[in-house]
């Protein structure tokens, strides 16, 4: 019974964390993060660091697979952040 209670508690905490990171637009995210994901499941994610997955910046600030790169990095043709 204790194991079931612990598992349920961990699950509830995980769900609360997921819900708290959801976003509808860039304005919902803190500095250094962007709103990315599918139409129904967007989350605030950190901008890409060196070698990490990225999407090029766009004027609509709509991203599906990842965020743009951190400052002083560029998103390469293979969607990885690298030195500009």
Swiss-Prot record:
What Gene3D superfamilies is this protein classified in? Lipase, subunit A
The answer, when asked if Mitochondrion is one of the entry's keywords, is: no
List the keywords (alphabetical): Disulfide bond, Secreted, Signal, Toxin
What GO cellular-component annotations does this UniProt entry give?
Answer: extracellular region
Would you say which domain of life the source belongs to? Eukaryota
Residues in the signal sequence:
1-21
According to UniProt, the tissues expressing it are described as:
Expressed by the venom gland.
**Chief location bin:** secreted
Q: Which GO terms describe its molecular function?
A: toxin activity
Q: Where in the cell is it found?
A: Secreted
Instruction: List the disulfide bonds in this chain.
Output: 23-35, 29-44, 34-67, 54-75, 69-81
The record's similarity note reads:
Belongs to the AVIT (prokineticin) family.
Q: What is this protein called?
A: U8-theraphotoxin-Hhn1d
């Amino acid at each position: 019974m204790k194991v079931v209670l612990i598992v349920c508690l961990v699950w509830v905490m995980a769900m609360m964390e997921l819900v708290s990171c959801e976003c509808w637009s860039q304005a919902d995210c803190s500095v250094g993060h962007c709103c990315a994901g599918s139409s129904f499941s967007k989350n605030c994610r950190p901008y890409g660091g060196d070698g990490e997955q990225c999407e090029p910046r766009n004027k609509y600030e709509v991203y599906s697979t990842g965020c743009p790169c951190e400052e002083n990095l560029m998103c390469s043709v293979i969607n990885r952040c690298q030195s500009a």
